[in-house]
Amino acid sequence: MEDPGETGAHPLGATNLNFVPGHQQKEKPSTDPLYDTPDTRGVQAGGSQQPARTVSLRERLLITRPVWLQLRANAAAALHVLRTEPPGTFLVRKSNTRQCQALCVRLPEASGPSFVSSHYIEESTGGVSLEGSELMFQDLVQLICGYCRTRAIHQAATHKELEAISHLGMEFWSSSLNTKDQQRPSEAPPIPRLKARSPQELDQGTGAALCFFNPLFPGDLGPTKREKFKRSFKVRVSTETSSPLSPPAVPPPPVPVLPGTSSSQTERLPPRQLLQRESSVGYRVPGSAASPCLPPLPSLQEVDCCSPSSSEEEGSSGSPTTSPRLSRPRHRRPLLRSMSSAFCSLLAPERQVGRAATMLMQNRYTAVGQLVQDLLTQVRAGPEPRELQGIRQALSRARAMLSAELGPEKLLPPERLELVLEKSLHRSVLKPLRPILAARLRRRLSADGSLGRLAEGFRLARTQGPGAFGSHLTLSSPVETEQVRQKLLQLLRAYSPSAQVKWLLQACKLLYTALKSQAGENAGADEFLPLLSLVLAQCDLPDLLLEAEYMSELLEPTLLTGEGGYYLTSLSASLALLSGLSQARALPLSPAQELQRSLALWEQRRLPATHSFQHLLRVAYQDPSTGCTSKTLAVPPGSSIATLSQLCATKFRVTQPDAFGLFLYKDQGYHRLPPEALAHRLPATGYLIYRRAERPETQGAVAEKAKTGSKGPEAGAWEEETGGLNREGKPRIAVDQEGKDQARGGHIGPEEQKAEGSQALEE
């Protein structure tokens, strides 16, 4: 068990809590007898059963609280109880040293010498949370619900059975009700058996469907059945229409053995290890800065203005009247190919994750469901100040909770998972609230006169032409204007802010194509903003003002740091410039000044603070036994290399930290860093490596350099060896940092810096 004063990794990064029974299932009426306690197989017995009622996850935790909440137990007692339990089993005890509650979780055997991890629980006025985590819950039961991964250990489905378990208290762990199968690994759920049905049942259609689709949970047999389904249909699906499903790494096993199957068929079953998903690796830094970011929006060069976008499916019923489409009619695909594509899309991991996220958000008994349903009720009740900002904060919190719930299934990579969850939240929250929010924005902007000033600015711009903006550029033909108008109409129909930004990028690309044909390749913001303002006036869509505010407030902050945020700000600046035409001003602001003023106001309110990203360092770890891995560590400003080395020893679980050290990998060589050097003042032309110091001469040279310090003439030699610092004294090492230059449209993001870190590991 870990030291009580030293917290382990985040529970989501290791093993999820699985003491609570499996999925919420309704009790089906049965003629079997029902007793007050379940038998060892989890089968109910006793008298007649009560009417069907769902036992929620929160109710199970509340009823069985005397079993898992052991405030009188110490660390040794928790270790004694959890040593024979399967991974994921948990207890809550009280720490005598910290005077707070501690969540003890059983880890897998392969996780290291310590098979029990302790996580301290912090209590505040806003609720409870794990130490180092920003996820806040109302109470302890709500916290455990947020981190529980449902797994059917006990099939207790009634209140009587749960109360019988509750009466045992601490004795439950050694009782006959706590049964564990010793013949198989505890972390591997059993293979479900298929129930054979008679031909009469199949003809009548009273049973289930003929095709079995594996649900999202537990998910161990998902790729196997998916592969069988693909092999059962002799249909060749082209790469253009097939879903991104990959075959399993090993040949699929046969169908689970039915009752009465011969032993020879049983011997052909592969071992259970082949069905296991790969374990999660890496380290999740607490806080929003370390959560998986959404993939960036496509750049202006990557946007295809002529191809249909996926956001076309997100139109709302209350869309404005559209003009005739200018695109050529689509060719209808063959029926067989369409059917095969539809079947494969049902099995796509994105659809499975989306359906699971929707079910969690619709279930009020879950933590994320309660958050989403309360948000919908609150917004529908009436307007509040800073309403859109509150909705964005609730969406970010709900996405973090969904990621914690669905992330351990490893169906999707982290970036793709965050994107799918964000789309699911938009569909479940923003789609029903879209008409309400649009009506409130329109009412507010009409009351303060913003829409009236914009409509008057549109009229003046159409009358004066390009001269109203001090420019001579315009679109050459009405067809180009109509194409841009169609993109903006699609923007008005969409309810998802990310889809709206994609339509905006397509419209801006059309404008830039026309701009380059007139002003050349060197055209910039001073030429683009007048052209955008003129085209907006010709399109005559005043609702773009409320859509600009809708996108600016509800778009994920990490998506505002690229070209999408740049052109969204350009749209806001252009609308502000048009609104100013109706005011009696002798000399309006120039387009560049108007854009800079709008950018400055927007950055202060919406973009994430840069200081929250500048304390993250990515360190690679060379383990002689398991190979290379890397983690992103939160290092406070002003920390030394000695402090960072201690943090690396803790996070990488090094048993002999004195034998390891931090090295700077540069010029095909390792250079050990002195302990007194500052972690954030390292050069940017290398990579941080935490490895074993195997060569004594390296240690001696480093010790000699450490003695000299930075006062003597040797300090310059060390700076020259390690690359030195820039003149501003800022760190230039390849770490996960973001700056304000990226927020203004820079193309270098944190994901590219992480990719550089992975290249260092390969070297």
From Swiss-Prot:
GO MF, one example: guanyl-nucleotide exchange factor activity
Ranges for domain VPS9: 445-587
Phosphoserine, modified sites: S198, S246, S319, S323, S340, S598
Post-translational modification note: Phosphorylated on tyrosine residues by ABL1 and ABL2. Phosphorylation at Ser-340 by PRKD1 induces interaction with 14-3-3 proteins.
Main location: cytoplasm
Disordered: annotated span: 1-52, 177-200, 238-273, 301-331, 698-763
Stretches with biased composition (Basic and acidic residues): 727-755
Stretches with biased composition (Pro residues): 245-257
PROSITE patterns: RA, VPS9
Keywords: Acetylation, Cytoplasm, Cytoskeleton, Endocytosis, GTPase activation, Membrane, Methylation, Phosphoprotein, SH2 domain
CC terms in the record's Gene Ontology section: cytoplasm; cytoskeleton; dendrite; neuronal cell body; plasma membrane
PANTHER family: RAB GDP/GTP EXCHANGE FACTOR (PTHR23101), RAS AND RAB INTERACTOR 1 (PTHR23101:SF62)
Stated name of the protein: Ras and Rab interactor 1
Species for this entry: Mus musculus
This protein's encoding gene: Rin1
